[in-house]
Amino acid sequence: MKSYGLSLTTAALGNEEKKMAAEKARGEGEEGSFSLTVEEKKALCGLDSSFFGFLTRCKDGAKMKTLLNKAIHFYESLIVKAEGKVESDFFCQLGHFNLLLEDYSKALSSYQRYYSLQTDYWKNAAFLYGLGLVYFYYNAFQWAIRAFQEVLYVDPNFCRAKEIHLRLGFMFKMNTDYESSLKHFQLALIDCNVCTLSSVEIQFHIAHLYETQRKYHSAKAAYEQLLQIESLPSQVKATVLQQLGWMHHNMDLIGDNTTKERYAIQYLQKSLEEDPNSGQSWYFLGRCYSCIGKVQDAFVSYRQSIDKSEASADTWCSIGVLYQQQNQPMDALQAYICAVQLDHGHAAAWMDLGILYESCNQPQDAIKCYLNAARSKSCNNTSALTSRIKFLQAQLCNLPQSSLQNKTKLLPSIEEAWSLPIPAELTSRQGAMNTAQQSVSDTWNSVQTASHHSVQQKVYTQCFTAQKLQSFGKDQQPPFQTGSTRYLQAASTNDQNQNGNHTLPQNSKGDAQNHFLRIPTSEEQKIINFTKESKDSRSKSLTSKTSRKDRDTSNICVNAKKHSNHIYQISSVPISSLNNKESVSPDLIIVDNPQLSVLVGETIDNVDHDIGTCNKVNNVHLAIHKKPDNLSASSPSSAISTETLSLKLTEQTHIVTSFISPHSGLHTINGEGHENLESSASVNVGLRPRSQIIPSMSVSIYSSSTEVLKACRSLGKNGLSNGHILLDICPPPRPPTSPYPPLPKEKLNPPTPSIYLENKRDAFFPPLHQFCINPKNPVTVIRGLAGALKLDLGLFSTKTLVEANNEHIVEVRTQLLQPADENWDPSGTKKIWRYENKSSHTTIAKYAQYQACSFQESLREENERRTQVKDYSDNESTCSDNSGRRQKAPFKTIKCGINIDLSDNKKWKLQLHELTKLPAFVRVVSAGNLLSHVGYTILGMNSVQLCMKVPGSRIPGHQENNNFCSVNINIGPGDCEWFVVPEDYWGVLNDFCEKNNLNFLMSSWWPNLEDLYEANVPVYRFIQRPGDLVWINAGTVHWVQAIGWCNNITWNVGPLTAFQYKLAVERYEWNKLQSVKSVVPMVHLSWNMARNIKVSDPKLFEMIKYCLLKILKHCQTLREALVAAGKEVLWHGRINDEPAPYCSICEVEVFNLLFVTNESNSQKTYIVHCQNCARKTSGNLENFVVLEQYKMEDLIQVYDQFTLAPSLSSAS
């Protein structure tokens, strides 16, 4: 870190001597500048980003805002006087202050300066949280997600973890990553800490998430469960009833259409009883009345909708449809014009308007309307519109020009209609609404300078910044509506494309302003279109302001990139590369590829919980660091080498509050090591006097367990480490950037390493093993393996499988049959990365029947094609001409059978015995296979799985679980085509997934080879024939498709190498940061390896020993903290073949000390929680018992006995 003359300690919190000296040095220039009294400094010292959204809950919230403004001027004046040569804490604190005043551009600027000056910025959770809030405000969701995930990674007990989970839930929901969204909503729901949303509001969003996923019965059950809650807030109840009404109108939940509409109307009427001013409920009610033919009631409801809320393009479009049904074309025209003037991109209104003109025999105007509809990004039937436009144009060409000119028009042309006056009720209503909103908005945002933001975006921000009803005083009304109201109304604006009566309208911009967060369903592939205008302004503001303010002082700036889903991706780039467009990196903050940090705690007493504060002190120890010139992430190959393995352990001082403190998590203090205390200053910006800083603890992996535990005890009765198992000195995990220099284009299709076996001796030749596990070979194809070893592949044929176990379960993935290596959207209009496949289950017998029928059908189709050769050449030329632009849709549906478990030795004895003929390094079980030391079966990893395929069946892109190697043998009779990308390019594919709103780890995706070629990503491509074995090396990315009818068997292998262990642990930590379960329990496995294996490779030994050291310390400190808090630890030893325990809430591995609810313990179900989730559920752990699976003496013995074994060469 760069250290300068003026420190935050001197400016705000230093001792009197330092302050007097500083004041004397400043001399007369201090006069006339802003100054802070001692009391004001004390009031400010505890404020950081964790108060965002909670400041108004203080008794003196208004006075605090005034003080914040004063403090900002004070700090800025000091920075000016020091010519910018101040310590980094100034900028971090300025960022916090500006954030609390909602001046986001200034907050971002200050945070950027802090980042550029502070080398280990990632240790400061409050900084990361504030940065995430700013990115969230600017709708830079991918950046906000990264920042929030890093907060939870470095500090799982961060006091605003619940707020983070809420925001992550919303962002993943907007990105259509519903599984991740649900997980974070559930994590927020179990947290008992204070939050800006109540538990019932969180439950509502979980219910709506089910609805968005089209899990309507689950959504209905969740909504009805909410209605059973006594004293349910009126606004929540109204919105729940609204959603139930709309679902009954749209979905086949019960009975016939008449019954559906009756229930829908009843629910909506009840909703209006709770909230008669809900324009959305009135609109939905109008739709229901229109559906059953109650025209007058529908008109009345639509009128009420316009009166109760902002004018909506949806409403006016529906009114137009109603007029058109009543044969009132002029009134319908006027309503449609209102709709498209409110939202120029309202595809449904343009289509309905085109239908109206066409019905009035005005094809020219109809064509214009259809063209506007087709240009709209919300249009989902472009192909049908295009066909209709061509048909009408052909008709016009056949008509004489005179007939067109002399024809009487029933309606004004589109140009004339556009100029007609809008109904007075619309203009007056819209003008009054905008005026009122602007007035309230200006009052509330008086402290902001970003006045250019739209009303829509201000509402959006206020909701998500926790300025809901609870944030205001009893007599003070929030601007517009409360946060909960906005949250609920946002979710209630549902998909309206499911009623078949007419072409349905989409939400207009006006409607988006009223309901800031339009939640689309999976059918609508137009994610967050409602925020496009605000994103334009915010992204431009973000770029211009930061570049203008920080161009000379920061090494990063913000660059907005627009992507196809209309979300602006923000990229962080070095200032020096601004003029080089090719050097822009997609990373949020460019850092080295991470390992991990363990945080050790110390007790702090007298914790205050008055207003749900964050009881956390940010101790920034300002040691001198040299900022690396190149911040680009290194590849994983070098990320955890022996050079970076620190054998001398320097602990971060991650201090925690007392272990048992009610209504609070383990509120932490983020500290940093004191490399140079003489030239650095420890700054306390917390609410209370700074706690005693824990001295650095230095132990080596070669230290005995006695020395390790003694060093732990020397820290006193400390708190808890976070259980990470890599290094302390590196930031949170990050995907690697693309290797540099990039490969030339001619090397992007490299030849696949292949080995041809002629006999059994070749298969057992030792260099074959070394060739396969060499990190330079991402994949190896061993040709002719089955023949060389005389394997009976017929044991795995479909016929034999049916005879052996015909009722065995098969997981089926229903997919679309795509052309060649491409992946098109269902309409066949564009290539996409998202690969749709739905999961179900069947039996081997039924899938075998499907496989056989598919083959017979293919034979029939082939015969039919041969008989239709007369048009073959024409069809061929047409297809080749269009191959690059579109594909004929709809695509045929096929089914792929996967994850067929062959682990049961009793059922599959012959099959499993046959595989023992394989060489040891590819066997399912062997001493040199790490997965054989897990101690229990992990299906598909240390056991065999089988896939049954038909042509076109695909396994989407992925890396193996925890980056282990993979073995795949093609049984035949058909071939498979493989696509493989080396491990060090997985970061590039992760970026592509993010740009396409996909989760690299959890989503189904099929890469576009053209995108990879443009990004200079090499792709190995080869055919796997029957009897060939494909070895996928550690971390290799791959995707596969069948080009014939075939079966495959597969399992994972873990070579006993440092490279394999390193990648496995890196992925373990990346999974933890991404809130994804690691299938392989690396902590449990590491201890078993120490028990069972003699390791002679120094690199591998050091990594395993380091893991043992970290976990031994974690167990010791956690156990001592529990005992000191009076919490009894009960013995609960492990049994043979017992799976490693995982937290039932967050799915992280839990080692040794298990937190189990009292109820679960008494029922012997043992539902496990990790310490973090246990404390969030029950602040003082009163509802939990702690079970211990290993005696500390046993762990100590394993640790001491695990030593570096002599290598074979040295032994000889």
Swiss-Prot record:
Residues of the JmjC domain: 907-1070
Enzyme class per UniProt: oxidoreductase
Disulfides per UniProt: none
Pfam families: JmjC, KDM6_C-hel, KDM6_GATAL, TPR_16, TPR_8
Cofactor: L-ascorbate; Fe(2+)
EC number: 1.14.11.68
TPR-type repeats, residues: 88-121, 125-158, 165-193, 200-233, 245-278, 279-312, 313-346, 347-380
Biological function: Male-specific histone demethylase that catalyzes trimethylated 'Lys-27' (H3K27me3) demethylation in histone H3. Has relatively low KDM activity.
Binding site for Zn(2+): 1143, 1146, 1170, 1173
Catalysed reactions, semicolon-separated: N(6),N(6),N(6)-trimethyl-L-lysyl(27)-[histone H3] + 2 2-oxoglutarate + 2 O2 = N(6)-methyl-L-lysyl(27)-[histone H3] + 2 formaldehyde + 2 succinate + 2 CO2
Residue ranges of the region described as Disordered: 530-555, 865-886
Subunit structure: Binds TLE1 and TLE2.
Keywords: Chromatin regulator, Dioxygenase, Iron, Metal-binding, Nucleus, Oxidoreductase, Phosphoprotein, Repeat, TPR repeat, Zinc
GO biological process terms on file: cardiac muscle cell contraction; embryonic organ development; establishment of protein localization; heart development; heart morphogenesis; heterochromatin formation; in utero embryonic development; regulation of gene expression
Feature: compositional bias, Basic and acidic residues: 530-539
Modified-residue entries (Phosphothreonine), positions: 752
Gene name of this polypeptide: Uty
UniProt family annotation: Belongs to the UTX family.
SUPFAM superfamilies, A to Z: Clavaminate synthase-like (SSF51197), HCP-like (SSF81901), TPR-like (SSF48452)
GO cellular component, as recorded: nucleus; protein-containing complex
Protein name (Swiss-Prot/TrEMBL): Histone demethylase UTY
Binding-site positions, Fe cation: 958, 960, 1038
Cellular compartment(s): Nucleus
Organism name: Mus musculus (Mouse)
GO-annotated molecular function: histone H3K27me2/H3K27me3 demethylase activity; histone H3K36 demethylase activity; metal ion binding; RNA polymerase II cis-regulatory region sequence-specific DNA binding
